[in-house]
Amino acid sequence: MIQQESRLIVTDNSGAKEVLCIRVLGGTRRRYASVGDIIVVTVKTVVPSSDIKKGIVSKAIIVRVKKEIRREDGSYIRFDDNACVLLNSTGEIRGSRIFGPVARELRTVNMKIVSLAPEVL
């Protein structure tokens, strides 16, 4: 579960390393976000000589969370880290590659992330 002030790693090659969640989208009383939800983030650390600068505000989609997710068949899945993928203003992925596994729940939200990911759990 991701909330305001949560830090996430960026798992694409956009140039950002770590981001801070500043807003969970989806209503005024919505506190938590999970896999497949869109959040507003600010970039905290970047790769040297990248086009993304520290402090940029952007939208991101969550691809991995530490909190376990219950699936339709009753099984649970959880990951080792909280990770997201940065989006541009039109909602497309900023990077061209995704590192690490992503959750199967993203198929209903964004198919391009699933096709770029090396492993879908």
Curated annotation (Swiss-Prot):
Keywords: Ribonucleoprotein, Ribosomal protein, RNA-binding, rRNA-binding. GO terms for biological process: translation. The keyword Ribosomal protein applies. It comes from the Bacteria. The keyword tRNA processing does not apply. One of its GO terms (cellular component) is cytosolic large ribosomal subunit. GO terms for molecular function: large ribosomal subunit rRNA binding; structural constituent of ribosome. Signal peptide: none annotated. SUPFAM superfamilies: Ribosomal protein L14. InterPro entries: Ribosomal_uL14, Ribosomal_uL14_bac-type, Ribosomal_uL14_CS, Ribosomal_uL14_sf. HAMAP family: Ribosomal_uL14. Belongs to the universal ribosomal protein uL14 family. Binds to 23S rRNA. Forms part of two intersubunit bridges in the 70S ribosome. Part of the 50S ribosomal subunit. Forms a cluster with proteins L3 and L19. In the 70S ribosome, L14 and L19 interact and together make contacts with the 16S rRNA in bridges B5 and B8. This is Large ribosomal subunit protein uL14. It comes from Azobacteroides pseudotrichonymphae genomovar. CFP2.
